[in-house]
């Protein structure tokens, strides 16, 4: 990999850890806060330097539009030939009715054309976030969470799950006897799901986030 300064390596490693932990990269503000920069603008300068060195790619106009480049084991990376020239058409899922598939036609309010560089893996749909239970992971009310359909997920990944009649976004952790769905906000309680519960179904994992107003 291209030789980086110590500070650039810190930024690069932070991006990599964030993608491994949550499925999507940090915002400029999160980088600044984590590494003690004076402002998000300082983080932006380091990101541009990394882009010039060819180790990341920046998507214009997106707070989390950062992709790792030039390493074979980059976590969950989504690559397409000539990705900058292509667009993904993704359905936006609003409220989900009890007992019906999450991608049922009646749940889809519209489709968005999105730059593939916004996501760490190819998403299947966008889910409009409701509430602040994942606030401390940078997921806010009204955000659009990019979701890849999966039937399995790793510990620490942010998932979309069906619990009975509800659909929720939480961080997954395996515990003795079941699963814990962890909220990233101390005002919300975690949810324990017993092993084999018929009430639980994994709908997918988070692979990107679009802040309200970025599309």
From Swiss-Prot:
Enzyme Commission identifier(s): 3.4.21.88
Enumerate the residues marked as the site Cleavage: 98-99
Main function: Represses a number of genes involved in the response to DNA damage (SOS response), including recA and lexA. In the presence of single-stranded DNA, RecA interacts with LexA causing an autocatalytic cleavage which disrupts the DNA-binding part of LexA, leading to derepression of the SOS regulon and eventually DNA repair.
Q: Which residues bind DNA?
A: 28-48
- Family stated for the protein in its record: Belongs to the peptidase S24 family.
Where is the organism placed in the taxonomic lineage, from the top?
A: Bacteria, Pseudomonadati, Pseudomonadota, Betaproteobacteria, Burkholderiales
UniProt enzyme class = hydrolase
Q: InterPro entries from the entry?
A: LexA, LexA-like, LexA/Signal_pep-like_sf, LexA_DNA-bd_dom, LexA_repressor, Peptidase_S24_LexA, Peptidase_S24_S26A/B/C, WH-like_DNA-bd_sf
Q: Which Gene3D superfamilies does this UniProt record tie to the protein?
A: Umud Fragment, subunit A, Winged helix-like DNA-binding domain superfamily/Winged helix DNA-binding domain
What keywords would UniProt list here? Autocatalytic cleavage, DNA damage, DNA repair, DNA replication, DNA-binding, Hydrolase, Repressor, SOS response, Transcription, Transcription regulation
Fetch the CDD domains from UniProt: S24_LexA-like
GO BP annotations of the record are: DNA repair; DNA replication; negative regulation of DNA-templated transcription; proteolysis; SOS response
Q: Which Pfam families does the entry mention? A: LexA_DNA_bind, Peptidase_S24
Tell me the subunit arrangement. Answer: Homodimer.
Catalyzed reaction equations? Hydrolysis of Ala-|-Gly bond in repressor LexA
Q: What protein is this chain from?
A: LexA repressor
Entry annotation: catalytic residues: 133 (for autocatalytic cleavage activity), 170 (for autocatalytic cleavage activity)
- What HAMAP family does the annotation carry? LexA
Q: Annotated Gene Ontology MF terms?
A: DNA binding; serine-type endopeptidase activity
Biological source species: Burkholderia ambifaria (strain ATCC BAA-244 / DSM 16087 / CCUG 44356 / LMG 19182 / AMMD)
